[in-house]
Amino acid sequence: VVYTDCTESGQNLCLCEDSNVCGQGNKCILGSNGEKNQCVTGEGTPKPQSHNDGDFEEIPEEYLQ
């Protein structure tokens, strides 16, 4: 299971592919074999294959209002 990049703040917002934002308290699981990405309960987690300062991406402000 691979998660999308999440915000560095404690907001627990994860940005799925296609700009799908999982709400607070949820994380995104990338779909495989043509399945769509899913938001499931759980704190957001950065992609496990990279552990750099650049792991995090800002959530567009329109999603934070």
UniProtKB/Swiss-Prot annotation:
Cellular component GO terms, alphabetical: extracellular region
Region of interest (Interaction with thrombin active site), ranges: 1-3
Keyword Glycoprotein: yes
Positions with biased composition (Acidic residues): 55-65
Single annotated GO MF: serine-type endopeptidase inhibitor activity
Main function: Hirudin is a potent thrombin-specific protease inhibitor. It forms a stable non-covalent complex with alpha-thrombin, thereby abolishing its ability to cleave fibrinogen.
Annotated protein name in UniProt: Hirudin-3
UniProt source species: Hirudo medicinalis
Phylogenetic lineage: Eukaryota, Metazoa, Spiralia, Lophotrochozoa, Annelida
